[in-house]
Amino acid sequence: GLNVFAEPVRQGDLTLVVESQGEVRPRREIIVAPQISGRISYVSPDFIDGGFINKGQLLVRVEAADYELAVVRAQSTVASAQQALALEEAEAELALQDIEDLGISDASPLARREPQLAGARAALESARAQLKDAQLALDRTAVYAPFAGRVRERNVDIGQVVSVGQSLGQIFANDVVEVALPLKDAEMGRLGLPLAFSSSKAQPGPDVTFRATVGGVEREWHGQVVR
């Protein structure tokens, strides 16, 4: 006869392994560029191809003399505008006193020196705005690293004249990297991932283990599918 064997079903965890390979890319990579023009007066010794940099580290400085002079001029303009406003306020006060003493009830705005006072106030606001612009330009003579990471390449040196937006080099963050892993439809199904998957706190992606040989040494990193 036919022998039939039965095995009780046991509930347990099953690990499905899908293998793939891809290129490691930094999540953040930017071109370092100045927001003002001028001659380079300083370059950090760490700002070299392959160099390590810290967040907030000074990478490059543009000669600041012209921008410092612009700030001094703007400060002088503000001081002059403040003095002019103070004089105009005094003149307006005297004009109002004269109008009151003469008993004039329908004095014109010009007689009350209202246009002159408004003009002096506007001149002061304009001078303050110019000072703010000059100070901002001076601050921008220093170019800092927005994050910690490494330098992919440097395109500038001391003495070089640069313009606004010119590439000084490229840096990338090394805290988080991304790897694009090509998967077949069947492999996506084994992982239980829809085609438009995007991880969230409620639905995190599956864990990923990366292995690579670096300098003859087998290394391993752990990550997670995010999209």
Region locations from a protein language model:
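Beta-strand/loop subdomains of soluble extracytoplasmic proteins
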Residues: 17, 176, 183-227
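Amphipathic alpha-helical coiled-coil segments and their boundaries
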Residues: 60, 67, 74, 99, ...
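Short, compositionally biased
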Residues: 72-83, 181-188, 225-226
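Short, surface-exposed secondary-structure boundary micro-motifs
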Residues: 58, 64-65, 167, 173, ...
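N-terminal beta-strand block that forms a small beta-sandwich/beta-barrel module immediately after a flexible targeting
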Residues: 1-45, 130-132, 145, 155, ...
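Short, Lys/Arg- and Gly-enriched loop/turn segments at beta-strand edges
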Residues: 63-73, 175-180, 219-220
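Surface-exposed patches in structured soluble domains
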Residues: 23, 51-55, 137, 142-190, ...
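Extended amphipathic alpha-helical segments
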Residues: 16-19, 76, 80-84, 88, ...
